[in-house]
Amino acid sequence: MKNIRNFSIIAHIDHGKSTLADRLIQECGAVSSREMSSQIMDTMDIEKERGITIKAQSVRLNYTLDGQNFVLNLIDTPGHVDFSYEVSRSLASCEGALLVVDASQGVEAQTIANVYIALENNLEIIPVINKIDLPAADPQRVKDEIEHVIGLDCSGAIEVSAKTGAGINELLEAIVRRVPAPDANDALPTKALIYDSWFDNYLGALALVRIYDGEIKKNDEVLVMGTNKKHIVLDLMYPHPIAPIKTARIGTGEVGIIVLGLKNVSDVQVGDTITLAKNPTKEPVGGFERAKPFVFAGIYPIETDKFEDLRDALDKLKLNDSSISYEPETSIALGFGFRVGFLGLLHMEVIKERLEREFDLDLIATAPTVTYEVVQTDGQILRIQNPSQLPAVNKIEMIKEPYVRSTIITPTEFLGNIITLLNNRRGVQTKMDYITPERVLLEYDIPMNEIVMDFYDKLKSSTKGYASFDYEPSDYREGDLVKLDIKVAGETVDALSIIVPESKAQSKGRDFVKAMKEIVPRQLFEVAIQASIGNKIIARETVKSMGKNVTAKCYGGDITRKRKLLEKQKEGKKRMKAIGKVNLPQEAFLSVLKID
């Protein structure tokens, strides 16, 4: 056991984490050069295309130093804010972490967020300055930044280039010498933390565990503490990026995959503890929170008869991603669908894309919302995720909305743009710190509702892509909020309702109806598009009717004949307007998402 090292890699997006992992795998000879593909740890196509890591992967490496054999378990972590939950549980399974920082970019917001998770778990952190082969690399400046912002001593920082392979051996040696061996006890009852689970078509639900005490052998009867169910261990494997390696036992301090032959991943929930049925441990592994969805959106199949297919697809995705939650809902405008909860916007995009790709569905997503707390006049408190659930105005005492604590790091020249953007989004500044004369760190409290739409895009475009952003949930605060409804031809379109601050309602309503006017197809009768708060209409646009030339067949003759035909047409249009229905195209829903 003293020769085991469990470590993970922490880095901001694009600082070269997956490439560094590839290099370590290659150096230890875990994968032959023929089988090596770039970003071998990123198994989903969508991960490789977007260049991000979504699911945490693991790999067991063998390394020899001074004639001794060591086992290095590399536990990969995603870098994006939405997946910080995956990060926290990956880090809970390690004793050490490599803090990878790009030698030309310096410290970014997510680097800081993940380092704090690592420090809370008391990990040994080794600073690694990557990409030293770049012409713009300035390792010394980056070391100073790490010391200033995070307060880590960088005298032992290791400079590497994952691309050329420089410094990789030195890094492996540092992992062995500086990361502590697992502190665990063979004699205690078995205790293992499930830090990932996924579904395999042949083997069923698999649990990736880190063993803290004791051991697990093939054919043992184990107890999953969260569900209190017993299962037989059918197989044990060590993780490997290409094909897992079978083993008869997994010992203390090790990382491995347990096959229990389960049909459902909810039986091996991430964060649960596995122990032996005959000698169970008293306490589960602590310090572990469930993922809570923050952003909710309605997802509907474009073809209404595909509802059951969508349910199956969500069930299957839930097997791999325990952080999504969903329940069926109906909309007058869109038919049957689901209200799905996500960790954030990127998570929502990725899930929607995976549903469309992997299950061949055509979907439409409504505007994302957050969970509001509504205090009613009778003292009852409602938690709502869908604007259409909001009670009548006269029953509402107040509406509270969730706030997030955000960290933004930006070059000083864009400071003005960012402060303007944050003030427009009702942000409250809590801290401002110059890391270097060129870069500044801002901390703001912002309503979650203001960042779920397009905040990230706006932030990037107002700083030419240089700012980095990270957030964590803070608390609920009272807000001056109203529900904005959109009516088309007098009927409220429930899927387009949103909750907005009263001060922005007027302008938001105007923008809404303008955008809708461009999209609603012209009918044979005129269509009014209105934005309303309660019964009060605050904005209106009209889509003009298409006219048929009813007088075309009259050649010359009496004017009264023409007038009679035009009057008849007018009557018909009136009748049509009273009973006519307008079918809204898909773009109508998407365009509303884009309105700032």
Curated annotation (Swiss-Prot):
Alphabetical list of InterPro entries matching this protein: EF-4 (IPR006297), EFG_III/V (IPR035647), EFG_V-like (IPR000640), EFTu-like_2 (IPR004161), G_TR_CS (IPR031157), LepA_C_sf (IPR038363), LepA_CTD (IPR013842), LepA_IV (IPR035654)
CDD domains: EF4_II, EF4_III, LepA, lepA_C
A molecular function (GO) term: GTPase activity
Enzyme class: hydrolase
Gene3D superfamilies the record matches: 3.30.70.240, Elongation factor 4, C-terminal domain, Elongation Factor G (Translational Gtpase), domain 3, P-loop containing nucleotide triphosphate hydrolases, Translation factors
Stored NCBIfam families: lepA (TIGR01393), small_GTP (TIGR00231)
Protein name: Elongation factor 4
Organism: Campylobacter curvus (strain 525.92)
